[in-house]
Amino acid sequence: MLSSRWWPSSWGILGLGPRSPPRGSQLCALYAFTYTGADGQQVSLAEGDRFLLLRKTNSDWWLARRLEAPSTSRPIFVPAAYMIEESIPSQSPTTVIPGQLLWTPGPKLFHGSLEELSQALPSRAQASSEQPPPLPRKMCRSVSTDNLSPSLLKPFQEGPSGRSLSQEDLPSEASASTAGPQPLMSEPPVYCNLVDLRRCPRSPPPGPACPLLQRLDAWEQHLDPNSGRCFYINSLTGCKSWKPPRRSRSETNPGSMEGTQTLKRNNDVLQPQAKGFRSDTGTPEPLDPQGSLSLSQRTSQLDPPALQAPRPLPQLLDDPHEVEKSGLLNMTKIAQGGRKLRKNWGPSWVVLTGNSLVFYREPPPTAPSSGWGPAGSRPESSVDLRGAALAHGRHLSSRRNVLHIRTIPGHEFLLQSDHETELRAWHRALRTVIERLVRWVEARREAPTGRDQGSGDRENPLELRLSGSGPAELSAGEDEEEESELVSKPLLRLSSRRSSIRGPEGTEQNRVRNKLKRLIAKRPPLQSLQERGLLRDQVFGCQLESLCQREGDTVPSFLRLCIAAVDKRGLDVDGIYRVSGNLAVVQKLRFLVDRERAVTSDGRYVFPEQPGQEGRLDLDSTEWDDIHVVTGALKLFLRELPQPLVPPLLLPHFRAALALSESEQCLSQIQELIGSMPKPNHDTLRYLLEHLCRVIAHSDKNRMTPHNLGIVFGPTLFRPEQETSDPAAHALYPGQLVQLMLTNFTSLFP
């Protein structure tokens, strides 16, 4: 591709290397320019200012002094690209030295492209002309070689095959083949990118009163009648720009560029091959119907006051996802990788976009600029909705208007809103996105097995079969179809791409990929395994109602084992339930009790050797001789319950009953509230309080009074569903309630 700048190699060939400026050379500013010097002073140049050229420091900056300034004033640096050099008319032309390629002093010409150079070449052949031709006002898009001088056409000799000539090679070829002294110009021309200088805007674009030429999405193209240039206006934002709007993703071939200029040469000048030339990149360059070669040149665009610099290749930008819905909801996470978590409700700004549900900690300002979230904030977490299951969470929370989201990795979230219409809108939006993702996955599975254009070897995560309900049972025909699809779209990238395509190693790796992807596609979700009884839920962190239903009792068996061990050898221990046990041993006991699995910190599953080991667990063995380990495991079991033993919905009523002045009325209301609790909660609470009454009977030895036991078990039994801002205020009345129940146990539990 030709370039519009002459590089130092071309300067050396043409004899135009860096040299001192001719005496009496003047500069005229083409455009206004302002910069800050090294000493911190600001230098401003206005259009039409004239300077006396002192020295051409480099190709970008020249040292000059203003004409009206005294000779003792300090010179300044001016941008060479913004200046035009002029000479004093009193200069006389110099003689031509035979055998050398020199020009006589004279006004310098600025050639912004190869076309302007070709237009200026005929003036060289006239020895008598001392004044150069005027600068062309407009560039031609295409110049035929009929208008070029014969001296320029001489270097191109006919031959069996032509070769591509760059803009740097063109003047060198012309000068190398010139025989004898040539009539020269009065001053060597200076080549710079005049096209880029002309494209630099001197003023902002005019208003939209100009005629509309074209509409592209929200951008309108108009023509400025004064300058003859096109400008663009965004009809939505009102933004005006001289530059055309950039697309976020370009599908054009990099070889075909905008703003190309063509130089046509006749068949007698260049003899191209029958099927076209081959460029440096290895792709054949097209020929026009007359057989002439087309040389393309991409014009670069400068933003003033930046100077010419190489621009990187355009990158493909991902299209921004459209925001489906956003709003303020109450959110809590109840499961992480299949492990139950304690509820922690809190407000969150939720954004539904693409295939993700993004959560922000803080709500946006009153008028957010976009639906993505608060400006300058980072998302707290996100949920991948591919294969997710959406349902109402009435059975998971006592709150109203709750949505339950379960994902493939085993993460579960609850979304709640005080307004039913708002939650219905979220339910419709989430269901629409999930169904669209399911249809997309099914369409991809039924599509042809060919690799998509432009995707390369990149694996799309949506190629996996993400199903949130039921095991994926594939027939033999489906296996064969899936295997053919997996061969063309491998799941894992093992070693390199070349080894996976060619040779026996690549075949083996493809076979491994196919097996792995078939295994993942057939792997049933966790919910289906639990429904079929293959995987049973844990003991710690399990719903009390489901645990009792599975065990066929109203009191969990692990709670019975712990209370029996404490009744046997712990009632006389000083500080029972007040002293903490060894946490490592407590976790070991918990691991043995859990029926399903233990989840490590990095998300891996550790399965016990045999499920259901709590049935054969002996807490009287020497391994559990420390009674504080047993009591610590009992308290941990109560804390890990997803719902506290006393339902959070009854907490305000318990607190109101406690505030009554009459004791009989207070006990009557508390008894009614206890009777309204579910059967597993009621029986478990009674079994626990009955055991604590036996502990109080030995308070002379263990020093555990009703007040001390209320401090230990109050925050656990009467835990609120949402954390309060003042924990001290909440920790007061639960202990009083437990103390009241222990003191009046016989009247509350007849």
Swiss-Prot record:
Keywords linked to the UniProt accession: GTPase activation, Lipid-binding, Phosphoprotein, SH3 domain
Transmembrane domains' residue ranges: none
UniProt feature, compositional bias: Basic and acidic residues: 446-462
Entry annotated with the keyword Phosphoprotein: yes
Domain Rho-GAP: 542-749
UniProt note on tissues of expression: Predominantly expressed in peripheral blood leukocytes, spleen, and thymus.
Domain WW as annotated: residue spans: 213-247
Pfam family name, one: RhoGAP
Region ranges (Lipid binding): 342-345, 397-399, 432-669
One example of a Gene Ontology biological process annotation: regulation of small GTPase mediated signal transduction
Domain SH3 intervals: 22-88
Swiss-Prot/TrEMBL site (Arginine finger) positions: R578
Subunit structure, as described in the record: Interacts with FASLG.
Protein name, UniProt field: Rho GTPase-activating protein 9
Native source organism of the sequence: Homo sapiens
Classification lineage: Eukaryota, Metazoa, Chordata, Craniata, Vertebrata
